[in-house]
Amino acid sequence: MARQMTSSQFHKSKTLDNKYMLGDEIGKGAYGRVYKGLDLENGDFVAIKQVSLENIVQEDLNTIMQEIDLLKNLNHKNIVKYLGSSKTKTHLHIILEYVENGSLANIIKPNKFGPFPESLVAVYIAQVLEGLVYLHEQGVIHRDIKGANILTTKEGLVKLADFGVATKLNEADVNTHSVVGTPYWMAPEVIEMSGVCAASDIWSVGCTVIELLTCVPPYYDLQPMPALFRIVQDDNPPIPDSLSPDITDFLRQCFKKDSRQRPDAKTLLSHPWIRNSRRALQSSLRHSGTIKYMKEATASSEKDDEGSQDAAESLSGENVGISKTDSKSKLPLVGVSSFRSEKDQSTPSDLGEEGTDNSEDDIMSDQVPTLSIHEKSSDAKGTPQDVSDFHGKSERGETPENLVTETSEARKNTSAIKHVGKELSIPVDQTSHSFGRKGEERGIRKAVKTPSSVSGNELARFSDPPGDASLHDLFHPLDKVSEGKPNEASTSMPTSNVNQGDSPVADGGKNDLATKLRATIAQKQMEGETGHSNDGGDLFRLMMGVLKDDVIDIDGLVFDEKVPAENLFPLQAVEFSRLVSSLRPDESEDAIVSSCQKLVAMFRQRPEQKVVFVTQHGFLPLMDLLDIPKSRVICAVLQLINEIIKDNTDFQENACLVGLIPVVMSFAGPERDRSREIRKEAAYFLQQLCQSSPLTLQMFIACRGIPVLVGFLEADYAKYREMVHLAIDGMWQVFKLKRSTPRNDFCRIAAKNGILLRLINTLYSLNEATRLASISGGLDGQAPRVRSGQLDPNNPIFGQNETSSLSMIDQPDVLKTRHGGGEEPSHASTSNSQRSDVHQPDALHPDGDKPRVSSVAPDASTSGTEDVRQQHRISLSANRTSTDKLQKLAEGASNGFPVTQTEQVRPLLSLLDKEPPSRHYSGQLDYVKHITGIERHESRLPLLHGSNEKKNNGDLDFLMAEFAEVSGRGKENGSLDTTTRYPSKTMTKKVLAIEGVASTSGIASQTASGVLSGSGVLNARPGSATSSGLLAHMVSTLSADVAREYLEKVADLLLEFARADTTVKSYMCSQSLLSRLFQMFNRVEPPILLKILECTNHLSTDPNCLENLQRADAIKHLIPNLELKDGHLVYQIHHEVLSALFNLCKINKRRQEQAAENGIIPHLMLFIMSDSPLKQYALPLLCDMAHASRNSREQLRAHGGLDVYLSLLDDEYWSVIALDSIAVCLAQDNDNRKVEQALLKQDAIQKLVDFFQSCPERHFVHILEPFLKIITKSYRINKTLAVNGLTPLLISRLDHQDAIARLNLLKLIKAVYEHHPRPKQLIVENDLPQKLQNLIEERRDGQRSGGQVLVKQMATSLLKALHINTIL
């Protein structure tokens, strides 16, 4: 039975020319299958490669068979021998030597032997190089070196297979769309078709080394097209880290990007890696290889262990630092960040210097009502020596061993320590009038931070002495001046400050109520009842007793101008305690809301009360109130929290540490049941964290803050304007955070949460807002935009816009309400109806923004300043109200208080004339403060470095305004900083910024969103030029500027994401996102267009994005931008477009054809012919068009592309590529033969002949193949070239020593000879037979492998043909 089956199988098997029997299939390649064969004559096994003739024309088939017959003459132990070829009607069969063990690629498969050790790879690669040396000597370039084409015998002998013919098959295939070779092993010049040479095989050898070591070649994790892109784009393929130095150097030699710098195969055979492995092989291949491999692994492991240990030590060091910080942050006092940054670790001298700029915060001893009772005796008893001792230890960073952390003791000592902080900041010259407001907040912050390094004994030194409860000093704050005590004069900031003003406030002490209180207290002191009491309870009872006699309403008294300043503090303390006690969940909703609102007003009047609140109560009670499911309560509590943390980094850190961030974040989401008011309060809280300090920003990010910022990028820009601004500025702050976390990680988090589509939608909205605002403001789109520098004082900045076309940006700001006690009026408009930009993200200018020059206008004139101040003094008494009235009015009236139109307009004009602000792009938050009306006592603009800026000390100026001559000091300080503040007026209090430069971002944002909201007050004056004319125009201009500023920021954000890694870029490559982005190309102005094009260009550098860009019609949208001709950004725009198109079209013929269809060819030719610097992109693109498709070649011819190619023959660098493009165009010419006709012109023929004659030696080898294509594809061109001087040039170069050049020259001479009109004349005139004979007889001495075998064979066959023609 078995014999019958065998017989049956034998009869079914195929035979080839009755000489070979086809057996099993043993492989499959790009152009056919490989079968095992049996030679029926001698029984030898052979390999038979079967190639389909479906797409190969007869002419090319003959060439291929001639090539095989030529290759039969090659004979070397390290190459597979060609035995012949056979042709049937449907297939070409190539007969090859059979190598029994198969390919190395098959052996290293994971299910077989796996990757080889370096030593074994060296053994195999040495033999590969031997084979290549032979092939290259014979003039053959393999072009497809890889593991699958390296075959082995049982004895370990390596043979190179599949050389020479693959190229011919690829060129003959009329449907091919790829370059020759296998993608992952291809050299860059092969991919770019810029001239294949022997060095191309060396690159492939390097790829094969990595393949044998890792089982896969470089870039194998990519698809073929992206892999080709990376091969051309990268400096060199990735080399595994674990390799030895020798093999790494070997690979670097192979991967030289410039083929001329790569060593040849013969040189690489002497490389140390190959030599050392050969010596090791002689002793013991297997043992030596194993030991070496183990040593490498051990060394690598030890290195990794050392790295891990170093990292662990570094990490542990960081942890120690963190733990120390944490331990100090547990102090009960507010200064939890005293040791967290270097700027806080000030020396006494530093503090003294800061003290010279101390503020008016310290007027009236900077009284905190509940602490003022304990303060005065410390004033008398603290000595300079105490101060020096205190700070000496503080500077050394000593910490108490037994620190008492009870809140009561902290309270008890706060005032004393606070006072010491003030003592240290007293200037030496007490008579100087230089007390400015350069650092108003420092007094409070330094005082609060100081105790964190004070020992227990030092704290005891500042404990409350007997008699500390005396109110004598409290009610006589100025009496000490007359006493003239030097010690007290030098340590009392309020005394010196008030004394400078020569204020008559002491007359207020003659008030009857104060007289009665002092008399009562004096009586009690004489009776000894209160002399030793440190408890304020008896004191308050005394006060209340006196007050009952006069039946005074506390609520009405708080802001009653008739009550002297010294009488307000104890009354506010009582009110403060009552309000705080009502902040409990069991209180009614109305009570909680009312208490929160009154506390907000109180904190604005006296910001130092915040210290008391945070120290005694903290944020936890407020967090409990946030659990109440009532919107009014939540909103009111959030307002209170925001007022407390405003511009105070310590309080913000405190709030973060107790877990307030996640709680507030829960109110920031876009849930439908969440009121907009609550959301904007939460947004302001988060904005403060982002913009105050790096530490709070880190805590915000750690609590998953980035997704919250993404959520603020609402689609409805008109409705959520400021929230969108907050998100944009917040993202920039995140990106600017200088920490070990890579920016790419932040990009990935944001991209994962959907920021990219939101950014593009925001970009669209902002662009529309810019366009509409520009149109409405009368801008024609060509007028220059003032982005920084002085504002024109002749043009009013703020006003009411009467047109309705700005509806998109005329909405009230989301974050601009209720933080001044309700809907706040704009600081800059002349109407109290507009809301001010309280939560001002506009002040953020990230470093990523391009810097703009900023300037500040000269300070205001003295007379103008006095006018403003006098105006506000007049209105003081008429507009004061109680806390309750303040809150009710703030909540109930959106148009503010009725004031005369003259009063409204004058402050605005003063601002315009005196201090036109300018933008400051320093990367820091500029600080702009404005006072606008009864609804706001202090503007709330965020500050990144609060300690560098001035703050207002509540309403102490408000109480002392009529007496302190601050205007004089204001003039001396050269600013309006000390202008007194009156809450009913619409005036600008301050325009401050770091180094004197203020940001208009806040002003412009407030104007754009607040002023445009429209109460009609400004427009009520039809005859005023400032009401609806210039003001409306300037509002529109500034609105456009604000939108344009954020438009640029969004474009820069997109650019940041486009620069990120592949994962982030993949989020950008969704179809809808890219389509919307590309649609904006013709909508945006050139600066924004340039940024969007940069994004596209960055995406095009990632091979994984190319397919997505193609599907989104990137090429179709990019090319029209090349039509731009005018403008200073045209070159940059063209650069980005061409670079992106170059990346898209490189290698890929489909995209090249798409670019040609969309009209790129005329643009490319223009760049080339005008010798533009951008021709570096245009030239390769234009040359690639010849390879793309018939349609692209037709367009090339129609636009004169062939003439450009011919002109490029004079360009040394591009000549070879241009010649190859000409050859391709001719080879693919259609039946009309238009390319042939163009090349037959006399000037074209002459250019070709001249180029061959003058071609540089280094390019000579590369031009022979294109010339061979040209003369073999067109016999007419062949004859014309031959009779116009090409023939003698060909024959004269036969003495070239390179075998590849000689072989191609012989092929050219043979082709010319076969079509020459006068062959005998050619033979005789050029003495061709003798030159051929010299080639045949060459090599007598010492050349190995029999010399240039193929050259001799070719010369011999040509000589025989000449002999026949001579005889005939």
From Swiss-Prot:
Per-repeat ranges for HEAT: 25-62, 86-125, 218-256, 533-571, 628-653, 654-695, 699-737, 750-788, 903-940, 1025-1063, 1067-1105, 1112-1150, 1154-1191, 1196-1234, 1258-1281, 1282-1318, 1348-1368
Gene3D superfamilies reported in the protein's UniProt record: Leucine-rich Repeat Variant (1.25.10.10), Transferase(Phosphotransferase) domain 1 (1.10.510.10)
Cell compartment(s), UniProt: Cytoplasm, Cytoskeleton, Microtubule organizing center; Nucleus, Nucleolus; Cell membrane
EC id: 2.7.11.1
Membrane-spanning segments: none
Chief site of localization: cytoplasm
Binding site for ATP: I26, G27, K28, G29, A30, Y31, G32, R33, V34, K49
Disulfide bonds: none
Tissue: Expressed in both the sporophytic and the gametophytic tissues, especially in dividing cells. Mostly present in flower buds and mature flowers. Also accumulates in embryos, in roots apices, trichomes and ovule integuments.
Reaction(s) this enzyme catalyzes, per UniProt: L-seryl-[protein] + ATP = O-phospho-L-seryl-[protein] + ADP + H(+); L-threonyl-[protein] + ATP = O-phospho-L-threonyl-[protein] + ADP + H(+)
Free-text description of this protein's post-translational modifications in UniProt: Autophosphorylated.
GO process annotations (BP): cell division; protein autophosphorylation; regulation of cell division; regulation of embryonic development; regulation of extent of cell growth; regulation of unidimensional cell growth
Subunit structure: Interacts with SGP1.
Protein known as: MAP3K epsilon protein kinase 1
Species of provenance: Arabidopsis thaliana (Mouse-ear cress)
